């Protein structure tokens, strides 16, 4: 089966929402039906962007240190990683008519940096104007989760935690509300799923919906 066009799918949600798991499962399912698909993530996805990711996520400052990344420094790092990702991963995928599944994209910046940390929305929009061009996701899945359950999942993670796994419960509540608010503004391209349902059932529901868009 041959891809007819570039198709861009994004998974969004707070830490512990299951978005990384579902993005991997969708990638495998699409690959099985013979379509050309890549799985990527933000921040990251390319060699340069992964280096920036290390700077963003590593806790460089001791807990008792007064020195922290300013919220605009933090945001600019994310946007720099995004530009690298778009130039070196997304744009080549467009030219090759690939399906791209991305674990996080622009809505995470708005939910975390704008709504969560108070970064000026116009500042982010201005930078996006230059780095995004006409690139927009065709489908975005927002995975809604019970915050307490998400925090429990984070505690059980065997991988090394980063500073974004250590925010307060109130911050995650605020971020999740932001994701849902964003999704409700464009119901044609956003799909909100409650991740409290069975993982396998959710996996099947997402694939069925994506398949209906890819194969017409």
Each predicted region: which residue ranges?
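Conserved beta-strand scaffold positions in the cores of enzyme catalytic domains, especially
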Residues: 37-39, 140-142, 190-192
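Walker A (P-loop) phosphate-binding loop of P-loop NTPases
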Residues: 16
């Amino acid at each position: 089966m041959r891809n007819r066009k570039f198709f861009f799918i994004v998974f969004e949600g707070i830490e512990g929402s299951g978005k990384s798991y579902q993005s991997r499962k969708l990638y495998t399912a699409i690959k099985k039906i013979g379509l050309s698909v890549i799985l990527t993530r933000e921040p990251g996805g390319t060699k340069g962007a992964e280096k920036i990711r290390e700077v963003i996520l590593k806790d460089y400052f001791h807990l008792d240190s007064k020195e922290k990344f300013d919220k605009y420094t933090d945001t600019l790092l994310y946007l720099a990683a995004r530009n690298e990702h778009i130039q070196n991963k997304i744009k080549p995928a467009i030219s090759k008519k690939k399906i791209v599944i991305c674990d996080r994209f622009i809505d995470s910046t708005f939910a975390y940096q704008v709504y969560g940390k108070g970064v000026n929305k116009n500042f982010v929009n201005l930078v996006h104007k230059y780095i995004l061009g006409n690139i927009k996701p065709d489908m975005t899945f927002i995975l809604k989760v019970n915050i307490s359950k998400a925090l429990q999942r984070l505690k059980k993670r065997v991988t090394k935690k980063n500073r974004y796994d250590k925010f307060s419960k109130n911050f995650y509540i605020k971020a999740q509300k932001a994701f849902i608010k964003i999704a409700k503004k464009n119901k044609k391209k956003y799909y909100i799923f409650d991740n409290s349902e069975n993982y396998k059932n959710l996996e099947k529901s997402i694939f069925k919906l994506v398949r209906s868009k890819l194969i017409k």
